[in-house]
Regions:
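NAD(P)+-binding Rossmann beta1-loop-alpha1 motif at the extreme N-terminus of oxidoreductases
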Residues: 1-63, 88, 94, 124
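Interdomain hinge/lid region at the active-site interface
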Residues: 167, 176, 213-274
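NAD(P)-dependent dehydrogenase/reductase Rossmann-like domain
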Residues: 271-293
Length: 293
């Protein structure tokens, strides 16, 4: 019999995850504080509360923006653990500071359940195309027992080891992402200032040795000033970078490029580009170059 999966958080990442699982024949029950019309239209079953998911599902996954949100849906009056279930596996797909993950894990285990630290990486379109990467960590037994669920969410779910390893890998990955986006903006601004054709730059540089996935995704957006629809808002990058910096500082690892990137993303919060796609960071680079795109 197919597993019942509870999914809390049906936003830009959660909704395509739900659709992927439903397409693989998994019965997905979801909870979101706002409307769940798209989820229902995809074949999902709405739940009245996180507690209801804890009572009826074989496994519960959370994909939420902050530790406060995760704590509320797990430990609140109508939270998952209010169900009183023992042995329930909970997979947190959120990107949170490691100390917060550890704190949440301790509370989950005290309630007799198991938490997997399994942040997901990728923009919504990547997730919808089954190309989002899940960095799974925690109990290998729980991962193996629920491999079908992980494989239903994406074609790229990796088990990395002990709890917390997933978040560490996500921080390393996102360090690259933040730097690659800014590097793409800097290089393209240089090319524009040198009089190179915009479309030709995108066409020639995308398959070149200097390319990256972020260049391939965002160079066309930068050159067309197309910052909507939003794949990932600049404000989200600005929110997450302090976590990466703290992680590196705690390890005594200098990250000069990340610090420069952080300055740009922080500046962007005070601009009209804060809630536009992070490709709009090129506007600040252009401003520093005293040029118009």
């Amino acid at each position: 019999m197919a597993k019942k999966v509870g999914l809390i958080g049906l936003g830009a990442i959660g909704q395509p995850l739900a659709a992927n699982m439903i397409a693989k024949g998994i019965e997905v029950h979801g909870y979101r504080r706002s409307a769940m019309d798209a989820f229902v239209a995809a074949g999902g079953k709405p739940a009245a509360s996180p507690k209801a998911l804890g009572e009826s599902c074989d496994i519960v996954c959370t994909v939420l923006p902050s530790e406060h949100d995760v704590e509320a849906v797990l430990f609140g009056e109508n939270g998952v653990l209010a169900s009183g279930r023992k042995g329930l596996p909970i997979v947190d797909l959120s990107t949170l500071p490691i100390p917060d993950k550890d704190s949440i894990r301790a509370k989950v285990e005290a309630a007799g359940c198991e938490l997997m630290d399994s942040p997901i990486s990728g923009v919504p379109q990547m997730v919808a195309n089954r190309a989002g990467i899940i960095f799974a960590s925690g109990s290998k037994a729980v991962f193996d027992a629920n491999k079908d669920v992980f494989d239903a969410m994406t074609d790229k779910a990796f088990y990395l080891g002990e709890f917390g390893t997933g978040t560490k890998m996500k921080f390393v990955a996102n360090t690259l992402v933040s730097i690659h986006i800014l590097a793409a903006a800097e290089a393209l601004a240089l090319g524009v200032k040198a009089g190179l054709d915009r479309d030709l730059m995108v066409k020639v540089l995308s398959p070149s040795a200097g390319s990256s996935l972020q260049f391939q995704v965002r160079a066309p957006l930068m050159m067309n000033k197309q910052y909507e629809p939003v794949l990932a808002p600049t404000s989200l990058m600005s929110k997450d970078i302090p976590q990466f910096l703290q992680f590196a500082d705690d390890l005594g690892c200098p990250t000069p490029l990340l610090h420069v990137a952080a300055e740009y993303y922080t500046r962007a919060l005070e601009t009209p580009w804060a809630e536009k796609d992070v490709a709009s960071i090129i506007e600040l680079v252009a401003e520093d170059n005293k040029m118009k795109l």
